[in-house]
Swiss-Prot record:
It comes from the Eukaryota. It comes from Dictyostelium discoideum (Social amoeba). This is Putative uncharacterized protein DDB_G0268590. Residues 123-156, 209-264, 355-479 are annotated as: Disordered. Residues 237-260, 366-376, 425-479 have a biased composition (Low complexity).
Length: 584
């Protein structure tokens, strides 16, 4: 008996029946009787009750099925599979053609090769003639009655317009090529403007085609065939095409070819060897430019209303820009997520001069602006005036106190402090003097004699370990030209009442009466239910089990029903006795 690992086989033939030893030693295994839904994916390809191996859902009906593929006779007339055709295109294999072409294994006879050499020599001799002979012969076309040229399969150009002669040409292995003839005829310097046309006559075709190798765009030309021709490419190479004749020709084919030095036809090079890939329409980019909303220009009036918690503030930034006719301003809002706020305050005889720096490490230039800010904490309003960034605005500003804080003294008294953990970025400078916190409300308008000065430089950094998150809303710092004055006003407001978040999202907060999904309280339904319960209790006490027991949920009536009719659930006691008597 044939035994293999994992399964047992049984063959119902005569040799197996005659051998009694194998029948006595035959054992039935559990795997032989597995159903289809009992098999796992690993057991599916192992065994079947028939004793045949299943590979990918197909049975091997013969032991030589794996070897029988090499014994198949391949018919070249049938279409090749798409996979082999694609592989031939990728590898540039010239041996396999498309389904239309027949593969010819004939060897080229030496007489045909000699005829091709004679044809090339005649063309080269005629092209090397002086300009007088070529100009005189340009009026009448030359007739060449030589046999057709046999070319390599790399350029199978076929000069015939009749499709019925196509099979005959292919069977005789007559492939025409115009590459050598056109380039050799136009190689003379006298034929730079227009060379004499060539008329080629073949025995297979009845019609003749005239090829004029001139550089004009209206002249007919033949596209270069790919190394692996597809059917559409072969049918296209049968007839001559002019660039303006086909309406479906792309814009690249209708362009006038550049006149070469020799003045001959320019052979069209193809991007892809497959014609179907070449037929794909190249879509031109549309003139409409779709921009992301983040890249659009920012309008002058910005109203930022983020979703803030109760203790935070709403910031409305109004930018008023006055520019000349030639200059423009690019206002950008830098995001302050994951930044470091460096506060340096200098303590001296003059009022506090503090600076807030946000370090921005990027490839672009950092945006900086010198701002003069006065803060009134009573009204929670801050007015900020932006000036052009210069050192004069810091040093030569008019102060009510003497200028005892120069740039060198500021560096000596500079103390760096980290801001407190607040939900928003506090604009009050952190310093030892309390001059800015006790400013009266008359300093709302920005004056040159303001009591506090804040220099803000916006930059980026990555160290955030001990610092709190800054507010995502900052005043706009524009990039200003010399003839531009930009004023940014920041107004901070706090909500009046501590409102509930959940109530603010509701449209209508009025209390509606709740719908009761219970049935309406009716007296007769409840009375009927109680009456049924009492009747059932009385019937069970009296021993009449007509409707089933309420307390024990079992009755002899149901036991008798299950003995003779499990389908009929409801029946009287008389029907039960009648049916049981008939069964006896």
């Amino acid at each position: 008996m044939l035994k293999k690992k994992g399964f047992s086989t049984s063959f119902p033939n005569e040799d197996f029946i005659d051998n009694q030893d194998t029948i006595s030693n035959f054992k039935i295994k559990k795997e032989d009787f597995l159903l289809d839904f009992d098999d796992t994916y690993e057991q599916l390809n192992m065994t079947t009750p028939k004793g045949k191996i299943i590979i990918q859902g197909q049975e091997n009906h013969s032991p030589f099925s794996l070897k029988s593929f090499s014994n198949l006779s391949f018919d070249y007339n049938r279409p090749l599979s798409p996979k082999t055709h694609i592989l031939n295109i990728q590898d540039n294999n010239n041996n396999n053609y498309s389904p239309i072409l027949k593969r010819v294994n004939k060897t080229i006879s030496p007489s045909l090769v000699s005829s091709t050499n004679r044809f090339k020599n005649s063309l080269s001799c005629s092209s090397s003639s002086p300009s007088s002979s070529s100009s005189s012969s340009s009026s009448s076309p030359r007739l060449i009655s030589t046999p057709p040229i046999i070319s390599t399969p790399s350029s199978p150009m076929i000069l015939t317009s009749s499709l019925d002669k196509f099979d005959e040409i292919l069977s005789e292995n007559e492939f025409m090529s115009l590459d050598n003839s056109v380039t050799s005829s136009s190689s003379s310097p006298s034929s730079s403007s227009c060379s004499s046309p060539i008329v080629i006559k073949t025995n297979a075709t009845t019609s003749t085609k005239i090829v004029t190798p001139s550089s004009s765009p209206s002249s007919s030309y033949i596209e270069d065939a790919p190394s692996t021709p597809s059917p559409s490419k072969l049918f296209q190479s049968l007839s001559f095409k002019s660039p303006c004749s086909s309406p479906s020709s792309s814009s690249s084919s209708t362009t006038t070819p550049k006149s070469s030095i020799n003045g001959g036809n320019i052979i069209k090079k193809q991007l892809f060897s497959n014609k179907r890939i070449q037929d794909i329409k190249i879509e031109k980019p549309s003139t409409k430019i779709d921009l992301h909303p983040s890249k659009l220009q920012i309008k002058s009036n910005l109203k930022i209303k983020p979703s803030l918690p109760y203790n935070s503030t709403e910031v409305t930034a109004n930018t008023k820009t006055t520019t000349s006719t030639t200059t423009t301003t690019n206002t950008t809002i830098p995001t302050l997520s994951k930044n470091i706020i460096k506060r340096t305050s200098s303590v001296g005889l003059s009022p506090t001069l503090s600076s807030t720096q946000l370090v921005n490490k990027s490839s672009r230039k950092s945006i900086s602006a010198a701002t003069t800010t006065t803060i009134t904490p009573h009204n929670n309003n801050s007015t900020m005036t932006t000036k052009t960034p210069s050192k004069r605005s810091l040093d030569t500003s008019n102060l009510s106190t003497p200028k005892s804080t120069s740039s060198t003294i500021n560096k000596a008294f500079t103390t760096s402090t980290t801001p407190l953990k607040k939900p928003r970025m506090s604009m009050t400078p952190l310093s030892s003097s309390s001059s800015s916190s006790t400013t009266p409300s008359k300093f709302i308008n920005p004056l040159p004699s303001s009591s506090s000065k804040t220099t803000t430089t916006i930059t980026n950094s990555k160290r955030l370990s001990t610092l709190s998150k800054p507010s995502p809303i900052t005043p706009i710092t524009p990039t200003i030209t010399k003839t531009t004055a930009t004023t940014t006003t920041t107004t901070t407001t706090t909500p009046n009442k501590p409102t509930n978040k959940r109530l603010s999202t509701l449209v209508n907060t009025a209390q509606k009466p709740r719908k009761s999904y219970a049935p309406p309280p009716s007296s007769h339904i409840s009375d009927e239910l109680e009456q049924r319960i009492q009747e059932a209790l009385l019937a069970e006490a009296n021993g009449n089990y007509t409707g089933g027991s309420v307390l024990t949920h079992s009755s002899p009536q149901k036991v008798e029903q299950s003995e003779w009719s499990p389908i009929r659930k409801k029946s009287t006691l008389h029907d039960v006795h009648a049916c049981t008597k008939k069964n006896y």
